[in-house]
């Protein structure tokens, strides 16, 4: 029977994953809070102490730092000497390590954190197990992100958990532990940057960097311009997160944390033109992110507009010469690698909230056409583009999009009809190829009726209302194609 060690601070999906492992004939070992949760869920699990024959001591500071754990993880199974030594010491092989670390970054994000609290959230045993298992990836599967649970299970069931895939998991581990260690260094070095002011001039503010990874705002290389402001940093982060969702050339413009224009194209110049045309008024004074290098031609387009920040993976020398003619525009060079961090947090009175990032993308094949009329190919393309954008828009959110750009955005309204009115009234075009995209379900048929009055012929929404049928009936009445995704994307 294969053995797995599970010890996680982020408990998302761990019960379901553990149950599936037991069904796949894994014997589970765990520690502390993870074991308690599995016990409460009636998942068969043993204590790591059963492997080490040594109790957890010092309030859990020492529990997995033991040869019985690390010998079982590190043994090279192609070396008889290693296997003989394990046998002599009565040490079992460990086949899988599932670990994520104490929430150090979240803890030190609290401005009132004490030194003792920070120190207690420095994980020792977790990184040690992760690095040991990652080093021995040829024989051991290492999982650090809950987002990988399903893929691992699928590969276990299909007997395709091969060395190449384990190597990809190994890379994630070393990226994760490197970022974790860097966050610790930055905290104790006091790596914080005082900003001119916060969201408003009467608010003081500073920027604490917990990572300088090249794919983050904190690790961006600023090539030109004034110091980033508090609002610049927030808007730039939102802009970067959205543009990274696109594989094709894409441009995103953001104002006040909401996209005002998103465009794609065969070239980055074309993509930006589509984003600009989506709302040529609101882009003024905004933040623009591009997922391709800025060329001289694109630089001329960007130079003609007042922008606060321009983000790209690269700027050519000639493009820089053009853009630097404006002394205040901030130019940020950022790696467009997808951020591996799966959690985000926000402070509230007396504490903070932590959640997984809303990165889930519903596959098209899991979406369901619920109306008599099915979407055309062009309507599908419009829906899928809008569905990538809508999680980045404050709720209640309604987007209108075609297959190359957003054409109208209604953001942050207290009711869905109000958001739809704004999007429809501000739309640069409405025709049979434009889709209406909603971040939440329709509580009744009035939004669909309003869309029909403006000529909309395709709608995509999560579904899930007790009155879904009212919206479906209204769509059928007006010959509108409607797709439901089963997943909502509220943003507050």
From Swiss-Prot:
Recorded family membership: Belongs to the PurH family.
NCBIfam families linked: PRK00881.1, purH
PANTHER family xrefs: BIFUNCTIONAL PURINE BIOSYNTHESIS PROTEIN ATIC, BIFUNCTIONAL PURINE BIOSYNTHESIS PROTEIN PURH
Keyword field contains Hydrolase: yes
GO CC annotations, alphabetized: cytosol
SUPFAM superfamilies registered for this protein in UniProt: Cytidine deaminase-like, Methylglyoxal synthase-like
Residue ranges of the TM segments: none
HAMAP family associated with the record: PurH (MF_00139)
E.C. number: 2.1.2.3, 3.5.4.10
Reactions accelerated catalytically: (6R)-10-formyltetrahydrofolate + 5-amino-1-(5-phospho-beta-D-ribosyl)imidazole-4-carboxamide = 5-formamido-1-(5-phospho-D-ribosyl)imidazole-4-carboxamide + (6S)-5,6,7,8-tetrahydrofolate; IMP + H2O = 5-formamido-1-(5-phospho-D-ribosyl)imidazole-4-carboxamide
Domain MGS-like intervals: 1-144
Protein name: Bifunctional purine biosynthesis protein PurH
Protein's UniProt keywords contain Transferase: yes
Domain notes: The IMP cyclohydrolase activity resides in the N-terminal region.
Pathway: Purine metabolism; IMP biosynthesis via de novo pathway; 5-formamido-1-(5-phospho-D-ribosyl)imidazole-4-carboxamide from 5-amino-1-(5-phospho-D-ribosyl)imidazole-4-carboxamide (10-formyl THF route): step 1/1; Purine metabolism; IMP biosynthesis via de novo pathway; IMP from 5-formamido-1-(5-phospho-D-ribosyl)imidazole-4-carboxamide: step 1/1
GO molecular function terms listed in the Swiss-Prot or TrEMBL record: IMP cyclohydrolase activity; phosphoribosylaminoimidazolecarboxamide formyltransferase activity
